[in-house]
């Protein structure tokens, strides 16, 4: 069974709520999905997930929340052999911040693609100016993600 690791970076908890919702939706679809909100690099490496879903908010001036930033830095520094593994990213932001909108998700996406991971689906960007139910807004995208992950097994 394809194992999907769900990593999240949050400031106020919304990204973790979306990540937990994604975990349940992917499990409902028949995938082995695990939300790992504060996993250390070595533990993630030992888990050896076949796919990654990153769910992150953007904080400050386009920054990634600290815990996820530290993990991404370690992943990039150690360059695990994840070439060809499926990657998907959900960004949470607010268009009121202009060009910093979903900047953390864009940075995470680019850094993981540079390791050779395979983009499975266009990044989902959820705008806090337009929604108060990001979990519900993610539903159609999560359904497409589940279909593509099941096909990738």
Language-model region placement:
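FMN-binding flavodoxin-like domain, especially the glycine-rich phosphate-binding loop
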Residues: 2-3, 13-17, 25, 29, ...
């Amino acid at each position: 069974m394809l194992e999907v690791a769900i990593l999240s970076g949050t400031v106020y908890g919304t990204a973790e709520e979306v990540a937990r919702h994604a975990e349940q939706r992917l499990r409902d679809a028949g995938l082995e999905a695990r939300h790992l909100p504060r996993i250390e690099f070595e533990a993630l490496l030992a888990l050896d997930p076949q796919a990654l879903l990153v769910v992150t908010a953007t904080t400050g001036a386009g920054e990634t929340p600290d815990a996820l930033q530290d993990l991404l830095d370690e992943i990039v520094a150690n360059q695990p052999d994840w070439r060809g593994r499926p990657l998907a990213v959900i960004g949470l932001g607010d268009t009121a911040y202009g060009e910093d909108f979903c900047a953390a998700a864009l940075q995470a996406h680019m850094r993981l693609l540079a390791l050779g991971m395979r983009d499975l689906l266009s990044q989902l960007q959820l705008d806090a100016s337009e929604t108060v139910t990001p979990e519900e807004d993610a539903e159609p995208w999560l359904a497409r993600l589940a279909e593509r992950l099941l096909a990738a097994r």
